[in-house]
Amino acid sequence: MCGIVGAVAERNITAILLEGLKRLEYRGYDSAGVAVFTNEGVLERRRRSGKVSELEQALAGEPLIGRLGIAHTRWATHGAPCERNAHPHFSADELAVVHNGIIENHEALREQLKSLGYVFVSDTDTEVIVHLLHHKLKDTPDLAVALKSAVKELHGAYGLAVINAAQPDRLLAARSGSPLVIGVGMGENFLASDQLALRQVTDRFMYLEEGDIAEIRRDSVQIWTVDGLPVVREVVQYHEGAEAADKGEYRHFMLKEIHEQPKVVQRTLEGRLGQHQVLVHAFGPQAAELFAKVRNVQIVACGTSYHAGMVARYWLEGLAGIPCQVEVASEFRYRKVVVQPDTLFVSISQSGETADTLAALRNAKELGFLASLAICNVGISSLVRESDLTLLTQAGPEIGVASTKAFTTQLVALLLLTLSLGQVKGSLEEGVEAQLVEELRRLPTRLGEALAMDGTIEKVAELFAEKHHTLFLGRGAQFPVAMEGALKLKEISYIHAEAYPAGELKHGPLALVDADMPVVTVAPNNELLEKLKSNLQEVRARGGELIVFADEQAGMKNGEGTHVIAMPHIIDALAPILYTIPLQLLSYYVAVLKGTDVDQPRNLAKSVTVE
């Protein structure tokens, strides 16, 4: 991890590589580097620990000018974040490699290569790859042949870009478990781990499939499958407004993306609602026939997407009467799973490249699930390509590492799934679907009303400026919302935060409550409100300070140690979507007060493409 850029052209490509790295900064990283085969016929590199801007300064002082090069932003997995461990890695000053992923057998390969005389200067698993490839080149002068041989010895995940001083007209790539995309130009071609890195030079992309190896030249691309057979991958044209990668009037991408939620929720609903019901064919032409067979749902996801799945469980069981299990992908893939008959496997991922979620999907195909369905924000991702059915969210590119608009659009998509399954199976109560469809049409307006509380929440954030711990509480479908609120706060403000069902207070968390631990609660006006109020009294009795986001009809008022922020009234089924907004804003303003890097919080990456 975390970002790869490569280029082969008739012009100097250093600026292209640098701009590509800047466009990948949102993914999170701790060091950066670039290697170029210069016009003087020498393979040279520049590396820096820290930001891409520091690498840019190094290149300003010692420029690299050439027509072939690779670049990388690293998120440390093996070896500390330092210049010595930064990519690209060299072998004999004639071969350079950048790598996303984890090589699981790197220790054994390292010892083997040491015995052959190779000297290691870093602590990374990547350096093993470049020396192994150099060793393979002793048997053949063809870099593509050597790469095909080398990857057979690698166990784990990798996305590789390779250049060789002896073959200065080509860029090699290999993909297994880590995404790579080729950017197709006119007399020049490019490579990246994310097409966003290349949008300044092309709008035409070719996505490598699992196991592919590619040889990229200025005027041609040749690809081989995992079996070594030549293959042609489709060229896809991508259109996205330039404003997606620009903060505009906002201080941070995260704040911009929070405020985009009414618009992207509207987009996610477009073309999917009839007059009184959800249009089932939005999931695909075979969806209705397949949904009629569904008796159970298994949801698998990671992080924020997992929280979306937890909310969906309340909807699927409470509205559609369909049993549902939700599991973290990294746990699901490593345990023995008992699959109930006619179970729909649902995976959720913003990027569609989350390593554990992809692995869980591939594992699910061997376990006898009825079919697979992806909820995803990227229509050309691996998750979408490998699933039977898909419902795309329409969040647009999400630059901030902490997910915001992707989460709310995932919730909308999952509610559409719930209503579609209930409609086909006839398990919804009479009038429920028509009511919810009408409320969904109003949802963007309700979200706008919540965003109008921005100034109020900014003032509430001041209560957290000197705090080190926070407790989030919710009941029912609001418990996963509380979990998401706690995750956002810890991600970007570095304040320790935990979430619990409010009914569990007396089973442990109450021991932590005092004047130094704020307690944040979401309180829609539903059948659990009175029980929640009792839980909050337990907090106040122990001196805890309450921040309550409560329905305007809930009858809750400010008092000593109690700060109530009135929320627009909304039907209970949609409350998890609405109540997410103030928790995102709260986390954002607390982080701003603490002076953290909101868009690129420490130690985190946007797209987790390794286990």
Curated annotation (Swiss-Prot):
Keyword Nucleotidyltransferase: no
Residues in SIS domain copies: 287-427, 460-601
Primary enzyme class: transferase
CDD domains given in the database record: GFAT, SIS_GlmS_GlmD_1, SIS_GlmS_GlmD_2
An example molecular function term from Gene Ontology annotations: carbohydrate derivative binding
Disulfide bonds: none
Keyword annotations from UniProtKB, A to Z: Aminotransferase, Cytoplasm, Glutamine amidotransferase, Repeat, Transferase
Subunit structure: Homodimer.
Entry-linked HAMAP family: GlmS
Protein name: Glutamine--fructose-6-phosphate aminotransferase [isomerizing]
Gene symbol of the encoding locus: glmS
